[in-house]
């Protein structure tokens, strides 16, 4: 039996501004090494955020709704994955868009899948699968669609794109949205002025994903980068929002942040305040591809 949900006091929702769109196509690879964090730790962080995720993942949900609008009208095989589904917030919209498709809600965190079940989003046509996106327990050429929103930034782009290509059937589609290097730039810069410890994860770049798509065989992949800015009332609100969505895990970080260091960082961040509030920038990649 899954634990019951307890009512929570929601954080104030940030304002969000769309800044720009830049588009690319897949091309010859660029060799850019990217470090990865331990998956067990990532799973634990997201598991702890399962109860609070839906209430606080404002940007993630907005990006996901945009991704749902890009769903194709038909698939070569009526099987699809929501890869890194979290609490499966897009389940109903996905089922409405593709009513004849059998979905699997895939996540590394069993707690996220339990929360999805608690919220009534899993059924006989939308079933859970606790699995690693880089090593899926699925047959080759078995899926007509892979949908993934704000989940694969923890993966090695080369490995996960090859695995996605493996499970997709010929003519199968990939719809991916993922934060890129340069996201949370204000937070990273403010911390760098205080100390050189890692406080923000080093995310893969657009070049990393473009190279991975090319290497995996998605020669005609379309990549579009959008810059989005959220505005918050305080640095504390930013930190609480990241923790509430499981995005507070930082690879290589150790120990607690001291009060003096925190206050110094807050002072640096406050210098960035605008009339709208404290900005937090996200670079978001939208990637669409078809397996040949």
Swiss-Prot record:
Q: What is this protein called?
A: Malonyl-[acyl-carrier protein] O-methyltransferase
What broad taxonomic lineage does this protein's source fall under? Bacteria, Pseudomonadati, Pseudomonadota, Gammaproteobacteria, Oceanospirillales
This protein's record includes keyword S-adenosyl-L-methionine: yes
BP GO annotations: biotin biosynthetic process; methylation
GO molecular function terms here? Answer: carboxyl-O-methyltransferase activity; malonyl-CoA methyltransferase activity; S-adenosylmethionine-dependent methyltransferase activity
Check the record and name the HAMAP family matching this protein.
Answer: BioC (MF_00835)
Q: Describe the task this protein carries out.
A: Converts the free carboxyl group of a malonyl-thioester to its methyl ester by transfer of a methyl group from S-adenosyl-L-methionine (SAM). It allows to synthesize pimeloyl-ACP via the fatty acid synthetic pathway.
Q: Which domain of life is it from?
A: Bacteria
What Gene3D superfamilies does the database record attribute to this sequence? Vaccinia Virus protein VP39
Q: In which pathway does it act?
A: Cofactor biosynthesis; biotin biosynthesis
Is Transferase a UniProt keyword of this protein? yes
Q: Which NCBIfam families does the record cross-reference, listed alphabetically?
A: BioC
What keywords sit in the KW lines? Biotin biosynthesis, Methyltransferase, S-adenosyl-L-methionine, Transferase
Reaction(s) catalysed by this chain, per the record, are: malonyl-[ACP] + S-adenosyl-L-methionine = malonyl-[ACP] methyl ester + S-adenosyl-L-homocysteine
Q: Gene name on record?
A: bioC
State its Enzyme Commission number(s). 2.1.1.197
The family line of this record is: Belongs to the methyltransferase superfamily.
